[in-house]
């Protein structure tokens, strides 16, 4: 509720049981290609002065601890691989249930490969892993 109030949105009435995060663009506040273009578009021009500002940092403890179990997917050829692995470290630090599916270096496995190339064997493996993870969480 605190995060929703800071973002000036309503709390989602359907409780989230799990998240599948594929090649996440978690760090929108970095001084890089994503951080230079997205923050003002996503959060507005004065977001740094808002109550929502801390939540822009995906390693912010209150944000991380508010998340349901997460399945993270990346590959060594994903240009945002470092974002996913850093976020995974935050989930570990705060003892949040999660799983990391990190594929080895392969030129076909670029950013969001399982979405853009759904017929690759690794894409099938990703979708299967997400389905199994969600089913496991749902059974608990």
Where in this protein do the model-derived segments appear?
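Alpha/beta-hydrolase superfamily serine-hydrolase fold, recognizing
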Residues: 1-140
